[in-house]
Swiss-Prot record:
Protein name: 2-dehydro-3-deoxyphosphooctonate aldolase
Molecular-function GO terms, alphabetical: 3-deoxy-8-phosphooctulonate synthase activity
Keywords assigned: Cytoplasm, Lipopolysaccharide biosynthesis, Transferase
Reactions the enzyme catalyzes: D-arabinose 5-phosphate + phosphoenolpyruvate + H2O = 3-deoxy-alpha-D-manno-2-octulosonate-8-phosphate + phosphate
Lineage: Bacteria, Bacillati, Cyanobacteriota, Cyanophyceae, Gomontiellales
Source species of the chain: Cyanothece sp. (strain PCC 7425 / ATCC 29141)
Pathway assignment: Carbohydrate biosynthesis; 3-deoxy-D-manno-octulosonate biosynthesis; 3-deoxy-D-manno-octulosonate from D-ribulose 5-phosphate: step 2/3; Bacterial outer membrane biogenesis; lipopolysaccharide biosynthesis
One GO-annotated biological process of the protein: keto-3-deoxy-D-manno-octulosonic acid biosynthetic process
Chief subcellular location: cytoplasm
Subcellular compartments: Cytoplasm
InterPro entries membership: Aldolase_TIM, DAHP1/KDSA, KDO8P_synthase
Highest taxon of the lineage: Bacteria
Assigned GO CC terms: cytoplasm
A Pfam family hit: DAHP_synth_1
């Protein structure tokens, strides 16, 4: 498995420290992102965990037309740039259309391909052409071994730094389940694997005009993933998920984050990952 260089000071993969990709689901405001990024960074610093801040400038796949989507592309990138400069952490955000790739890559360290879009060839090639690290969420509809075709598209587009993320599979209506076999199966493709612990407990469209979630199961799934073996954990975090503007039901409380991460590090240490 290759080692992915996110910044000169942060690598993910073979022999590298455990990494957290985390932050609020959507950019609610610049001040809020700065506060969240700073507090999460402090936790990660105490635990010696590598940290990448995550938030979306646009939630283009919300259940309802009336749901909050985020800031504009320009304002969102300005917020992410401020997080990089003031908090001193690399940043990740997702793109939904090919034209966004080059623009967003001017600011972020990691481009994320949403699960619903993981087979979109033009989007993958546009992301690959930027030279940035690319984190691809495995589609809820996709077998883990079928991610080899996603990887081939990215490689043929010139991408060398790829992360593959498990975020659950559709199980009937409004429900996801996690098949942890997917983690070693995707790692066998030669790239680091990430587990998305919060979207894996999402209940897509489960509240009628928005998605539900079962955040109480996040720590259980995260512990299982670390025991199986992952290189990074993806987790959406909010100081008050009940008031969050997107994905509140599956985001974890900031106040609980450090305890969760301590448990995960203990498992990694016990298994000598």
């Amino acid at each position: 498995m290759v080692k992915i260089q996110v910044t000169p000071d942060l690598s993910i993969g073979d022999g590298q420290p455990f990494a957290l990709i985390g932050g609020p689901c959507v950019i609610e405001s610049e001040d809020f992102c700065l506060k969240m990024a700073d507090q999460i960074r402090q936790i990660c610093d105490r635990l010696q965990i590598s940290y990448i801040f995550k938030s979306s400038f646009d939630k283009a796949n919300r259940t309802s037309i009336d749901s909050f989507r985020g800031q504009s592309l320009e304002d969102g990138l300005q917020t992410l740039q401020r997080v990089k400069e003031k908090i001193g952490v690399p940043v990740l955000t997702d793109i939904h259309e090919s034209y966004q790739a080059a623009i967003v890559a001017e600011v972020v360290d990691v481009l994320q391909i949403p699960a619903f879009l993981c087979r979109q060839t033009d989007l993958l090639l546009a992301a690959a052409a930027t030279g940035r690290v690319i984190n691809v969420k495995k589609g809820q509809f996709l077998a883990p071994w079928d991610m080899q075709n996603v990887v081939k598209k990215l490689e043929q587009g010139g991408a060398q730094n790829i992360l593959l993320t498990e975020r659950g599979s559709s199980f009937g209506y409004n429900t996801l389940v996690v098949d942890f076999r997917s983690l070693p199966q995707m790692r066998a493709l030669g790239y680091p694997v990430v587990f998305d612990a919060t979207h894996s407990v999402q209940m897509p469209g489960g509240k009628g005009n928005s998605s539900g979630g079962q955040r109480e199961f996040v720590p259980y799934l995260a512990r299982a993933a670390v025991a199986v073996g992952i290189d990074a954990l993806f987790m959406e975090i909010h100081e008050n998920p009940e008031q969050a503007l997107s994905d509140g039901p599956n985001m974890v409380y900031l106040s609980q984050l450090e305890a969760y991460l301590q448990q995960l590090l203990a498992i990694r240490t016990a298994l000598a990952w």
